[in-house]
Amino acid sequence: MNSSIKGIATVTLALLLNYSANPAFALPQKINHPITVAKSQPLTDTLIVPGERVGPITRTTTKQDLIKLFGASHLVDKTISGAEGIGSFAATQLNLNQGRSLLVVWSDNTRTKPLDVRNLGSACKTREGIGVGTPLSELRKKLGDFKLYGLAWDYGGTILLDSSKLSRYQGKLILRVDAAPNAYEKFPNNYQAVSGDATFSSSNPHWKPLGIRLAEIIVVLNPSE
């Protein structure tokens, strides 16, 4: 188990979790296919299938496919920084309403192979009903008792899926929880008790007053080599 957890921290999380979502710059959009844009549809399929798809966005989706699906006016190309500012990655922001926005991170600047989908809105959920905003109590019902990293550091609140009932999603899905915005001010002792570079059980009583909810989902489609 120790080697497994170490592998998660050094490979999966380092490569996938810690890309900065802040754009370094945005590229101008060109609408070259007005007929295609007119046919664009809203994101009605919001099912997350770890390792396979987020709605219609799959392992083989390209930027041109996104234009056909949603229209160029809903897309903004970005470049995001890698962990600790090392490296950069092409990304495309999909701006929709009703909790359906998301960010596609690409394997290279051709934007023809997605690495992952992240910054998901609350409308996107797995078959188990897990989505952004799911409270810790519900996560425990679906995942069983699991381990997660402490709060307030780079990988804070990341769930170790190999310790849960959803271990089959390991390497395909990254889930990170966070406390309510005022949790530290209201419950500093509880907050500090489950903070830092350490793993804690989801049944630890110090979580209870902190308003823990799922804050981030990353759906891995084509893992980095």
Predicted region positions:
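Bacterial N-terminal signal peptides that target proteins for export
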Residues: 1-9, 19-21
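Short helix/turn-capping signatures at newly exposed starts of structured segments
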Residues: 22-155, 164-165, 173, 184, ...
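Short, solvent-exposed beta-strand-terminating loops
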Residues: 175-181
